[in-house]
């Protein structure tokens, strides 16, 4: 009978990684291998195949079937790096060791690799009976030298993930968190019989492991478990909490926000604040959650957000990583399409692609879709937009049409602030991945002033859906049809009547409205007109037009709209202002782009607003 060995044993014999051995098995380069479930059995006398990979380290064949599978939904580091295409993010470890903050909070949008990175940190730092260095010997961190290798496998680790704690009541949430702690406590079975822990510790361990604890006892579980591990190992543990804010967001939406905030504050205070049984800690989440509410008094907390350059390349894919992946899967010619759909995020100074969408794009035979926005949790944007007023909706409509807007950004924004101050919606949408910071300036008071825009086509689809739904509820279908007929026929009287009626019925106050407001209003209205590509603030002729409607099919007219606004104007001054707007279109030849595209009939509208009054000149 042929003696067989495991992938792990072959990796040790041949001095290569388990991932590499598994790849060789899948590609048929080791004779006699047998697949058993998710693993492989290899003849003990098999020889190590010659390494025919290209210098970059990626093994390529023309046939897609020979490529590594894509890690869709895989957050287990050992599995991801051994069995799937893995993008090496281990230099995160080096950057952390170089700085050594006591507690680090990483805030990034959902599905940007937070859980996989935290499991990577757990695997690297955790002291286990198994030699886990094999998972890093072909990674970038290992090439950095002994200084960094000395941290590998050195610490006990407490690892908790709250990513699935999404329940309707506080009681259900508490029960779920208690079960998570019980499983993690059971993972440290060595504490049950440790001769370095006293009877009091043993009783606490038993209660935690059995899930037989009160809310007060559970809120001190991090402090208690870290103290026991410190006693047993003689070295303080690393504490990692992944997606810490998921139950907090759920608490806000389901009505138990105060309960979860109080619990988390006590839990983190014991685990991270002045805990002498802590080596260092990591947290990840989407929102920072203000220090006053949870991290009160934690002066040892280092917060890393989407606006910070430090660690900016480790969550999501960089352009070089996407190019290499595209080449590996034989899709280098698709790079521009990937950029259009999934690039555009900017973390610090680094351009980042959405990793979830890129991986799904390759898995879907390079057919672009809105993968990220269909992963649930668009309740987030729905909840937020529900709090937006008309002006915010119109500014968001401007974003949909490719514009940028400038606003203050608070990366510590939380749900309750949005109801109190709707302008914080931009901060919320930025940190959750629905906007990107084009340019960031730190103001004198410590806040960020940012130019923001939509990151890519995938996200634009969400806004089109959500914002157009809002406008469709604001604007009756009969009005939209009447507006379209008036625009197509150049009937400025009919168009004026419809817009005037719409302003009177759908918007509450225009006392402080400026040109930007009316710009967004008209963009939203134009977005409802089928058969046109709507663009805004683009160069044409000798300047930039306000709004252009370019027909999708031949036979339809092209439309140029120039907007003006004034306060306290008379009927005559408003009429003159509309004529000034029309003259600007003509003088600056804003119709140049449409004529170059072969559009024969072009209507030009000068539209002037004052409060809820409008005047329109047509040419």
Regions found by a protein language model. Give the residues of each.
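Polyanion-binding surface elements
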Residues: 1-20
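Major-groove DNA-recognition helix of helix-turn-helix-type DNA-binding domains
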Residues: 15-41
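Alpha-helical DNA-recognition elements
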Residues: 23, 27, 123, 428, ...
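Alpha-helix C-caps/helix-loop-beta hinges
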Residues: 27-28, 432, 591
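A short, Lys/Arg-enriched interface patch at domain edges and termini
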Residues: 44-63
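Phosphate-binding site recognition
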Residues: 62-514, 529-530
């Amino acid at each position: 009978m042929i003696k067989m060995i495991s992938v792990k044993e072959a990796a040790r014999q041949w001095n290569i990684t388990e991932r590499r051995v598994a790849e060789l098995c899948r590609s048929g380069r080791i004779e006699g291998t047998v697949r058993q479930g998710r693993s492989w059995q290899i003849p003990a006398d098999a020889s190590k195949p010659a390494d025919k990979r290209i210098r970059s380290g990626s093994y390529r064949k023309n046939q897609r079937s020979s490529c590594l599978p894509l890690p869709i939904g895989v957050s287990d580091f050992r599995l991801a790096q051994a069995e799937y295409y893995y993008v090496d993010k281990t230099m995160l470890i080096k950057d952390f060791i170089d700085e050594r903050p006591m507690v680090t909070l990483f805030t990034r949008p959902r599905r940007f690799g937070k859980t996989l990175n935290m499991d990577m940190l757990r695997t690297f730092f955790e002291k286990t009976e198994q030699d886990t260095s094999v998972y890093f010997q072909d990674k970038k961190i290992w090439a950095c030298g002994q200084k960094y290798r000395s941290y590998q496998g050195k610490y006990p680790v407490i690892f908790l993930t709250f990513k699935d704690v999404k329940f309707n009541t506080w009681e259900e949430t508490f029960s779920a968190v208690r079960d998570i702690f019980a499983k993690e406590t059971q993972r440290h079975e060595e504490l049950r019989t440790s001769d370095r822990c006293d009877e009091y510790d043993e009783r606490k361990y038993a209660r935690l492991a059995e899930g037989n604890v009160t809310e007060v006892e559970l809120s001190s579980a991090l402090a208690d478990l870290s103290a026991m591990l410190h006693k047993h190992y003689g070295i303080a543990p690393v504490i990692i909490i992944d997606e810490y804010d998921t139950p907090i967001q759920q608490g806000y939406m389901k009505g138990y926000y105060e309960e979860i905030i109080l619990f988390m504050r006590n839990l983190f205070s014991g685990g991270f604040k002045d805990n002498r049984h802590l080596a260092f800690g990591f947290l990840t989440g989407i929102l920072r959650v203000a220090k006053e509410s949870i991290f009160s008094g934690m002066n040892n907390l280092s917060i890393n957000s989407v606006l910070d350059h430090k660690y900016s390349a480790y969550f999501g894919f960089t352009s070089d990583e996407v190019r290499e992946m595209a080449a590996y899967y034989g899709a280098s010619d698709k790079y521009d399409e990937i950029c259009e759909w999934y690039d555009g995020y900017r973390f610090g100074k680094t351009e980042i692609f959405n990793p979830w969408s890129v991986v799904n794009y390759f898995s879907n035979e390079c057919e672009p879709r809105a993968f990220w926005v269909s992963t649930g949790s668009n309740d987030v944007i729905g909840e937020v937009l529900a709090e937006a007023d008309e002006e915010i909706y119109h500014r968001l409509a401007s974003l949909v049409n490719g514009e940028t807007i400038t606003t203050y950004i608070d990366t510590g924004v939380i749900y309750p602030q949005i109801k109190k101050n709707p302008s914080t919606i931009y901060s919320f949408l930025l940190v959750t991945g629905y906007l990107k910071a084009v340019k960031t300036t730190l103001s004198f008071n410590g806040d960020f002033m940012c130019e923001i825009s939509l990151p890519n086509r995938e996200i634009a689809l969400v806004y089109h859906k959500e914002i157009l739904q809002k406008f469709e509820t604001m604007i009756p279908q009969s009005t939209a049809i009447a507006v379209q007929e008036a625009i197509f026929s150049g009937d400025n009287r009919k168009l004026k009547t419809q817009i005037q009626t719409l302003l009177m019925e759908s918007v509450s106050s225009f006392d402080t409205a400026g040109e930007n407001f009316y710009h967004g209003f008209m963009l939203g209205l134009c977005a409802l007109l089928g058969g046109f590509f709507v663009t805004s603030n683009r160069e044409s002729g000798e300047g930039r037009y306000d709004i252009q409607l370019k027909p999708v099919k031949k036979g339809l007219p092209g439309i140029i709209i120039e907007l003006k606004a004034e306060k306290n104007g008379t009927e005559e001054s408003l009429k003159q202002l509309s004529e000034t707007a029309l003259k600007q279109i003509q003088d600056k030849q804003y119709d140049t782009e449409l004529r170059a595209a072969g559009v024969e009939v072009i209507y030009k509208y000068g539209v002037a607003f004052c409060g809820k009054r409008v005047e329109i000149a047509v040419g």
